[in-house]
């Protein structure tokens, strides 16, 4: 990789890191927020969900605009909006007597910013390199940054909340400003090449792409939703039972939450390095990863204990980590650059649907016994494995599209 490309990748990797911290940092403190605001478990889960719902609706628009205006022109203002949303959430938590509704409004604004930030990074990496092995490696680094944010977030969130419960909200605008500076300094805006196609022609090209590649694209969209639903649902479950069942609080709780996420991060990095441009290997990593996630929660159905549960979640982390960069690589390498931002935005929307659905869905099943949560997880993961095996069919004879190296926009 060239030095210039490395600098761009560092700046781009800061975006998922910051966006993940801004969301996942709240997971370990949700029980604390529930107590401070005197709200239900479902209501507190909506603090995560409202952010994702808004992002889901706006991500396709952001993807389209990034194809038309350039990636950087969309990401920087979006990060600024996310910073404003975080600042509003922090301020109302500090100054308003009953801030729950205002917190949801601030989180909704943060979701608007998130729609144009993290999802645009994936097509950005595809634009950056012409060698698809480098694209896979770059996407592995992006997913590693994303998952490292999940590793750091429970520790950082718990540490900040130990000072003042709403301090994690104030960390969001600070982190966004850091990422904005990196993008402005290290990423050069790309000049528009040739004429921009009319909107009608562009939409027709997207429709044509879905007609030609719809089966495997929809499969990857579904897998993206399932994998994030499982991940955020299990994190919500673990965050809750660590306090209610095992009496683990504060930074220690954050450290426990970080264990499976650290393994997930390392697994993502290794998978991104190893898969190269081999789509058959990508498919195997995806369905094996889902099978590992499905199998990991079978043992806790019969044998109880925090250590065994953590071991099983580590196995799940390995599986999810294997699958994530492969999903990114398949969708990025299979789409033309001119349509990449729009098509990958649908994939990102589906991932956010999983993020939005996970906590409230798991909250509902947590009203019963623990085994209901494990059954739910295993069923979703098994469905994901079946989808990957049946509907993802790597092309054997088609030549993969090679991209020209360009500065990222």
Set out the residue ranges of the language-model regions.
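Juxtamembrane intracellular "pre-TM" segments in multi-pass secondary transporters
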Residues: 1-2, 188-219
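Central cavity-lining transmembrane alpha-helices of secondary-active solute carriers
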Residues: 49-63, 122, 258-270
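Conserved MFS/SLC helix-loop-helix module at the cytosolic interface between two early adjacent transmembrane helices
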Residues: 57-97
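Helix-to-loop junctions at the C-terminal end of transmembrane segments
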Residues: 59-71, 267-280
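Cytoplasmic helix-loop-helix junction between adjacent transmembrane helices
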Residues: 100, 106-148
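Extracytoplasmic gate region of multi-pass secondary transporters
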Residues: 215-257
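C-terminal transmembrane helical hairpin of 12-TM major facilitator-type secondary transporters
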Residues: 281-327
């Amino acid at each position: 990789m060239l030095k210039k490309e490395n600098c761009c990748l560092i700046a781009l990797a800061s975006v998922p890191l910051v966006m993940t911290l801004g969301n996942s940092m709240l997971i370990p403190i949700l029980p604390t927020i529930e107590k401070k605001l005197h709200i239900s478990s479902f209501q507190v889960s909506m603090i995560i969900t409202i952010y994702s719902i808004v992002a889901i609706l706006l991500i396709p628009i952001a993807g389209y605009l990034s194809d038309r205006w350039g990636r950087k022109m969309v990401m920087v203002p979006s990060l600024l909006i996310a910073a404003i949303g975080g600042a509003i959430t922090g301020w109302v938590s500090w100054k308003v007597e009953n801030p729950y509704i205002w917190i949801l409004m601030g989180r909704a604004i943060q979701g608007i910013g998130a729609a144009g930030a993290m999802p645009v990074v994936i097509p950005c990496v595809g634009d950056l390199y012409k060698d698809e092995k480098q694209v896979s490696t770059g996407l592995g680094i992006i997913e590693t940054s994303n998952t490292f944010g999940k590793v750091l977030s429970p520790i950082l969130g718990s540490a900040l909340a130990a000072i003042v419960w709403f301090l994690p909200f104030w960390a969001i605008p600070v982190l966004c400003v850091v990422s904005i500076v990196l993008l402005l300094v290290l990423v050069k805006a790309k000049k528009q090449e040739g004429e921009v196609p009319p909107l009608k022609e562009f939409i027709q090209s997207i429709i044509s792409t879905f007609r030609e590649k719809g089966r495997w694209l929809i499969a990857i969209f579904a897998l993206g939703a399932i994998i994030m639903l499982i991940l955020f649902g299990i994190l919500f479950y673990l965050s809750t039972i660590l306090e209610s069942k095992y009496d683990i609080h504060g930074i220690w709780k954050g450290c426990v939450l970080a264990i499976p996420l650290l393994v997930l991060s390392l697994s993502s990095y290794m998978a991104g390095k190893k898969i190269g441009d081999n789509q058959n290997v990508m498919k195997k990593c995806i369905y094996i990863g889902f099978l590992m996630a499905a199998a990991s929660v079978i043992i806790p159905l019969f044998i109880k204990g925090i250590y065994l549960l953590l071991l099983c979640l580590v196995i799940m982390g390995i599986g999810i980590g294997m699958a994530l960069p492969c999903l990114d690589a398949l969708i990025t390498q299979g789409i033309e650059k001119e349509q990449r931002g729009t098509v990958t935005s649908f994939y990102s929307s589906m991932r956010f649907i999983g993020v939005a659905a996970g906590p409230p869905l798991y909250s509902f099943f947590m009203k019963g016994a623990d085994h209901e949560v494990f059954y739910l997880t295993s069923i979703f993961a098994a469905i994901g494995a079946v989808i990957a095996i049946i509907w993802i069919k790597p092309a054997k004879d088609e030549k993969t599209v090679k991209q020209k190296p360009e500065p990222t926009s």
